[in-house]
Curated annotation (Swiss-Prot):
InterPro entries: Arg_export_ArgO_enterobac (IPR023445), LeuE-type (IPR001123), Lys/arg_exporter (IPR004777)
GO cellular component: plasma membrane
Catalytic activity, as annotated: L-arginine(in) = L-arginine(out)
Record family assignment: Belongs to the LysE/ArgO transporter (TC 2.A.75) family.
Membrane-topology descriptor: Multi-pass membrane protein
Free-text function comment from the UniProt entry: Involved in the export of arginine. Important to control the intracellular level of arginine and the correct balance between arginine and lysine.
The protein's name in its UniProt record: Arginine exporter protein ArgO
GO molecular function: L-arginine transmembrane transporter activity
Species of the source: Pectobacterium carotovorum subsp. carotovorum (strain PC1)
Segments crossing the lipid bilayer: 1-21, 37-57, 67-87, 111-131, 147-167, 179-199
Keywords: Amino-acid transport, Cell inner membrane, Cell membrane, Membrane, Transmembrane, Transmembrane helix, Transport
Subcellular location: Cell inner membrane
Source organism, top-level taxon: Bacteria
């Protein structure tokens, strides 16, 4: 069973590591040290729910409904364009103001809402968990499927907490106006690139 667990962990890591809306948001919260561990936990818990749904039967729902898949795809395109636009606005802003403790208190629920949107409106999450993991997980039966799912969940929890903690540790070097502009510009380019790829896929 350990081999199945390791297979799930490696596959989960391969899909989580590339930069996407989730990773960008967790990284930025870590740099700002704004509820970064809470954000990492909520991202990991969301992934756990999606992984469970995808591996234990949810993949059939998405793959069999072209209407639902289209809604997820184009909703994701719109969200990625909006997310990228926000990053670009920050990148080219003349004044990047670091959040104070009072601002962080006021923005807790907004941070949670943004994190949930970044996760649940991200089409790659459904494609990865429902289509890729769902199809691979269906090859296992009984306990083996549970071990495969546990491996992918372990990779998710490990990565999000590691990213949040590393970004927080590097915050003194990363949390400067110049570096923030570079990071946000890069995030904006990547988000728009993903949106373009999804749009091309949606038109096919």
């Amino acid at each position: 069973m350990f081999a199945v667990f390791l297979q799930g962990a490696l596959l989960g890591a391969a899909m989580i590591l590339p930069l996407g809306p989730q990773n960008a948001f967790v990284m930025n919260q870590g740099i700002r040290r704004q509820y970064h561990l809470m954000v990492a936990l909520l991202c990991a818990l969301s992934d756990m729910v999606l992984i469970t749904a995808g591996i234990f039967g949810g993949s059939a729902l998405l793959s069999q409904s072209s209407l639902l898949l289209g809604a997820v795809t184009w909703g994701g395109v719109a969200f990625l364009l909006w997310f990228g636009w926000g990053a670009m606005k920050t990148a080219f802003s003349k004044n990047i103001v670091l959040a104070s403790a009072e601002v962080m208190k006021q923005s807790r629920w907004r941070i949670i809402a943004t994190m949930l949107a970044v996760t649940w409106l991200n089409p790659h999450v459904y494609l990865d968990t429902f289509v890729v993991l769902g199809s691979l997980g269906s090859q296992f039966a009984g306990d083996a499927r549970s071990w495969f799912a546990l491996g992918t969940m372990t990779a998710s929890f490990t990565w999000f907490f590691a990213l949040a903690l590393l970004a927080s540790w590097l915050a003194p070097w990363l949390n400067t106006p110049r570096v923030q502009r570079v990071i946000n510009f890069f995030v904006g380019v990547v988000m728009w690139g993903i949106a373009l790829q999804l749009a091309r896929h949606g038109w096919q």
